[in-house]
């Protein structure tokens, strides 16, 4: 009988996780796994059926934590699933695990209790934890009152002088959009005002108008950004999955007030700077002390940790320093997608995380492959002249996909912000990140990963320019509402140019 893994959530990573669990072929750990989507988006069941993906779906009454908990408890009790991986952090932050703990089912969930979800849900508390256990973070960080502009100004000016930049962070859950980078003195007030405008309501809901509003300010870190996903079981065994690199800025170039951090515009795996020495550094400097902290604070349980880091390296590509930017407690979107498309035994790894024997299950990685994920997002325009993702988006427009063409070109399409009209039999956009396009390429040893990445980018660009993936604007039936970053994957080329004799 198949071991059934539920993935609870609504976005693209949720569906792809179920697809990979059901279809990936392991060489060592068996293949009898079934992926199950808990909730998903309305477009996903008909989309999966049209693609003949062997994925099952479990509905929920609504998108609340209570509805998820009810559906998951029923599914675990009736055998529809054997375990569950919550995908969005809000489910854990709102206490999903606590609900399952009340009925004796918490050992079937990967994640933390509401109390211990502070690792992601409270960045200031997480910084204190890292400091206590010598997990490297930014050289300087301060917890200040968001209502005290004079202190914020003074702190930012010092950090600009010493580190060339400062980062303001709303310290609570913000969907990956709570960081604001300041690169010069002129930006301080405008960036501060924008952050307060975006999160003032959230602050008031948490603390009221008269209390202090916690704000995290960090020194800007240099180096390259790199992400890791670590599975940890109840005994403290762990496995580090392949690396990824996120493209969080809306447009190419550094983040700024005009180029905001989004939920993610795309991702690649592996990171161009991935090396065996790097995995050793991560295990020693981050994972081992973090597990020690979890054990000593009675937090150790089946979980998934996702630290975003800054990496420094020498001219031989050897890692010299790594610092944690933040730690998340769920699979990232979209970084999770290219990672799991390179793993043959996702189901076995998740099962081992639940059962406590991760030391016996090694990730089977397609080490000869690179994978690229590109988010197709809602662009500008619409009835109210919307600015497009990540600002304001029009919805309800027809999605037009040439499935035969995309299958021929081996472009995998994952629906995300997409609905389905059963009466009309059509898919419609629902704003934000509508579709993810995933492509993989095998790279022969000694050959250029940059050239392979360029071929993959051209696949997606050609499909887009030829109208093979469209959201049809109401005002222009021949147009395309979708937009995307055309530079996803170019860091393979940049790495080869930087270290031509090594990469």
Role assignments for model-derived ranges:
Residues 280-307, 328-408, 412, 421:
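Active-site "cap" helix and flanking loop/linker of ATP-utilizing ligase/carboxylase catalytic domains
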């Amino acid at each position: 009988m198949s071991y059934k893994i539920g993935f609870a959530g609504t976005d693209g990573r949720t569906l792809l996780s179920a697809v990979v669990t059901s279809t990936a072929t392991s060489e060592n750990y068996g293949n009898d796994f079934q992926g199950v989507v808990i909730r998903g988006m309305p477009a996903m069941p008909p989309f999966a059926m049209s693609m003949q993906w062997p994925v099952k779906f479990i509905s929920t009454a609504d998108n609340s934590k209570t509805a998820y908990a009810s559906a998951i408890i029923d599914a675990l009790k009736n055998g529809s699933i054997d375990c569950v991986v919550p995908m969005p952090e809000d489910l854990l932050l709102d206490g999903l695990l606590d609900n399952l703990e009340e009925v004796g089912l918490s050992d079937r969930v990967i994640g933390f209790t509401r109390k211990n979800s502070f690792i992601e849900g409270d960045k200031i508390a997480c910084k204190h934890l890292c400091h206590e256990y010598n997990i490297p973070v930014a050289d300087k960080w301060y917890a200040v009152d968001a209502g005290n502009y004079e202190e914020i100004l003074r702190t930012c000016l010092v950090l600009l002088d010493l580190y060339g930049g400062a980062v303001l962070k709303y310290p609570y859950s913000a969907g990956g959009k709570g960081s604001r980078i300041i690169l010069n003195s002129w930006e301080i007030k405008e960036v501060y005002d924008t952050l307060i405008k975006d999160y003032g309501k959230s602050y008031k809901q948490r603390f009221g108008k008269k209390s202090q509003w916690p704000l995290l300010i960090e020194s800007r870190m240099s180096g390259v950004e790199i992400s890791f996903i670590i599975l940890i079981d109840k005994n403290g065994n762990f496995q580090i999955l392949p690396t990824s690199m996120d493209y969080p800025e809306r447009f190419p170039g550094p983040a700024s007030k005009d180029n905001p951090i989004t939920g993610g515009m795309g991702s690649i795996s592996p990171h161009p700077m991935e090396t065996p020495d790097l995995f050793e550094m991560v295990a020693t400097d981050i994972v081992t002390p973090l597990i020690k902290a979890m054990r000593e604070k009675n937090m150790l349980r089946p979980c998934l940790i996702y630290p975003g880091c800054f990496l420094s390296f020498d001219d031989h590509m050897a890692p010299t320093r790594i610092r944690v930017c933040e730690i998340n407690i769920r699979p990232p979107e979209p970084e999770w997608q290219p990672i799991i498309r390179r793993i043959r035994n996702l189901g076995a790894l998740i099962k081992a995380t639940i059962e406590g024997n991760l030391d016996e299950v090694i990730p089977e990685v397609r080490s000869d492959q690179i994978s690229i994920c590109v988010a197709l997002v809602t662009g500008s325009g619409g009835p109210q002249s919307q600015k497009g993702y990540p600002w304001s988006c029009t919805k309800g427009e027809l999605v037009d996909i040439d499935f035969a063409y995309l299958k021929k070109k081996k472009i995998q399409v994952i629906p995300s912000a997409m609905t389905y009209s059963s009466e009309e039999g059509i898919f419609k956009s629902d704003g934000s990140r509508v579709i993810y396009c995933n492509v993989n390429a095998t790279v022969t040893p000694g050959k250029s990963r940059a050239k392979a990445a360029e071929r993959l980018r051209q696949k997606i660009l050609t499909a887009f320019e030829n109208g093979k993936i469209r959201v049809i604007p109401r005002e222009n039936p021949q147009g395309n509402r979708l937009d995307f970053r055309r530079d996803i994957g170019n860091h393979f080329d940049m790495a080869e140019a930087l270290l031509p004799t090594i990469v």
